[in-house]
Amino acid sequence: VGSEMCIRDSSKGRVKGYVGNPDVCIPANSKGKLDVAGAVGVGFMNVIKDMGLKEPYVGQVALQTSEIAEDLTYYFATSEQVPSAVGLGVLMNKDNTVRQAGGFIVQLMPFAEESTIAKLEENVQKITSVTNLLEEGHTPESLLEKVLEGFDMEINEKVPTEFYCNCSRERVEKALISIGRKELNEMIQE
């Protein structure tokens, strides 16, 4: 994908991001799935959370497998100390564009009972492929029903997701001015 990948979201479902090489063509691996790990490569995952405190929370982990779901699971366990299960899937069109993507994140509450943990593990292990579930037409709600089978599930709120960029020419100009002419010229020379 390149040297950098940056994704930002908000609690309002607004997402924006960029990758160092947006035109990468991800081939299938030996299992016929997208070779995400091959495209992502080695590196680090940095997570910055603005929790309304004086400074944002910053967590960093080395990528373990470069499979996004697996590395998010690792991040939650090591950086935030929250046992989690993450499953992601992407349906691609023949022209290498994304038809549909989806997934889930399930996190245990502190002091979860062993029976709860065992049931969640059983449910997650039954899900062999989020991509296949998307192909079968599962909705976010029906995906959650599979993950949380045997639990009283209640959807309190639905937050639609959207690409959102709060960038503007004025904001970029202010950022460039704050860097200073000398540093900008040095950056151009490099």
Tell me the role of every PLM-derived stretch:
Residues 1-6:
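Short, small-residue-biased leader/transition segments that mark boundaries at the very start
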Residues 8-12:
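Glycine-rich loop at the start of a catalytic domain that most often binds anionic cofactors/ligands
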Residues 20-81:
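Hydrophobic alpha-helical segments and helix pairs
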Residues 41, 57, 82-84, 100-102, ...:
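A generic structural signal for well-ordered coil/turn residues at beta-strand boundaries
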Residues 48-51, 94-96, 152-156, 162:
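Short, flexible, solvent-exposed loop/turn segments with mixed acidic/basic and small polar residues
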Residues 76-78, 83-133, 145:
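Active-site environment of non-heme Fe oxygenases that use a 2-His-1-carboxylate facial triad
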Residues 125-190:
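Cys/His-clustered metal-coordination modules, chiefly Zn-binding fingers
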